């Protein structure tokens, strides 16, 4: 995952600030927008966890501060629910102009309600997910119900929410009064996922039921059992992100990852403008390789030498476990820690003139289990019998030839 700071203008020309999270290969299949809760901001830990889950599934996620909150310009006292909706529309327009039109809209609490209103105004949105969303915007006034009389009398009041003071004006409440979510949801006709915790004491579970009843199919409900309203537990927000990612893949278009084809076991592909960030297909698995930032890379994946060390580590643990199981020895866990010492930067500078350097792998093995010293010594010997270990020690030939671009019709898949 990589993070970009972005800025765009809202309807009033004020600057809104956000973060765009990209998947590790920098090639998202879809873009999503996340709307944070009332008086929250883009940096809520739960939002980051949900974003991380989505980027791990190939989505790019834009999370930003609504007008008057966080890093964004504007005075919160002059904002309202309609303004939040317009901010989401502005965010979608920014993505469409600079990246790609968003297809997934996610909102938490009042941000979820705003997402439902905004989805009706953003043609590119193909799916909407809400988390702990109220079934009507006016629900939020319960947070300052003791101040309603003061608002009616003087036109505004100061309320303390989450340890911070916020000025709420009468125009904010008037705007809420004019919003009806059930009618918007009924007319939305876009796939909807509703996530809500039964124990939510800020926005009761009844709200989820009312949204669900108002919506047309396809609609889904997922219970976030045991979670609080802000999804403070990491496992709750991560779960929500994984569910949203899996569910939305049914409704947004995801191109098949068939770019990399080969008749061999592994293929690596690197475009001219991608630096060292390399797309790879290893058997049936896709991954990204890169170089560290101090070598001029972006560190979006393991380096070539790290992959080589990984091969030795993986082969060693597999060989040890296979041997100990055959011997019926009690080994609960094997870990192999491997480092390669020769600097890749030095290799590259001297690769055509200096082949005398010794490649050294430092390998440390930890064993958890009921083993005596004789067994441990034998396992240490077995580690050297790992096939990759033998390959690294043996005389190896690499046969290289230039061929025409690979014809995908010849691929094994």
Protein language model features and the residues they cover:
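N-terminal cap/lid segment of alpha/beta-hydrolase-fold proteins
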Residues: 1-26
């Amino acid at each position: 995952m990589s993070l970009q700071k972005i800025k765009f203008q809202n309807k009033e020309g004020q600057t809104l600030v956000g973060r765009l999270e990209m998947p590790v290969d920098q090639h998202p299949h879809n873009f999503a927008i996340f709307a944070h809760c009332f008086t929250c901001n883009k940096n809520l830990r739960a939002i980051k966890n949900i974003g991380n889950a989505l980027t791990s599934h190939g989505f790019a996620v834009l999370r930003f501060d609504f007008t008057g909150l966080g890093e964004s310009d504007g005075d919160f006292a002059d904002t309202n629910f309609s303004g939040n909706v317009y901010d989401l529309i502005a965010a979608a327009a920014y993505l469409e102009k600079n990246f790609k039109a968003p297809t997934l809209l996610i909102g938490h609490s009042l941000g979820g309600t705003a997402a439902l209103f905004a989805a009706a105004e953003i043609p590119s949105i193909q799916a909407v997910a809400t988390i702990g969303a109220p079934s009507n915007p006016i629900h939020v006034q319960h947070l300052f119900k003791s101040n309603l009389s003061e608002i009616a009398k003087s036109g505004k009041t100061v309320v303390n929410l989450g340890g911070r003071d916020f000025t709420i004006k009468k125009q904010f409440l008037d705007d809420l009064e004019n919003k009806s979510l059930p009618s918007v949801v009924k007319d939305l006709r876009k796939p909807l996922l509703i996530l809500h915790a039964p124990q939510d004491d800020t926005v009761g579970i009844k709200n989820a039921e009312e949204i669900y009843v108002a919506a047309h199919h396809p609609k889904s409900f997922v219970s976030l059992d045991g979670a609080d309203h802000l999804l403070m537990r990491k496992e709750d927000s991560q779960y929500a992100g994984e569910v949203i990612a899996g569910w939305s893949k049914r409704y947004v278009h995801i191109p098949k990852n068939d770019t990399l084809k080969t008749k061999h076991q592994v293929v690596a592909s690197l475009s001219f403008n991608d630096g060292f960030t390399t797309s790879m297909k290893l058997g049936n698995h896709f991954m990204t390789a890169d170089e560290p930032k101090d070598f001029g890379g972006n560190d979006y994946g393991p380096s070539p030498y790290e992959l080589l060390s990984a091969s030795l580590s993986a082969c060693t643990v597999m060989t040890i476990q296979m041997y100990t199981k055959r011997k019926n020895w009690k080994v609960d866990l094997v870990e192999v820690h491997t480092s390669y010492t020769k600097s890749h930067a030095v290799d590259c500078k001297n690769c055509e003139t200096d082949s005398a350097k010794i490649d050294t792998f430092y390998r440390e093995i930890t064993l958890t289990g009921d083993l005596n010293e004789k067994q441990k010594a034998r396992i240490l010997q077995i580690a050297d019998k790992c096939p990759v270990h033998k390959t690294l020690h043996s005389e190896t030939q690499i046969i290289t030839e230039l061929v025409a671009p690979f014809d995908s019709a010849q691929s094994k898949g």
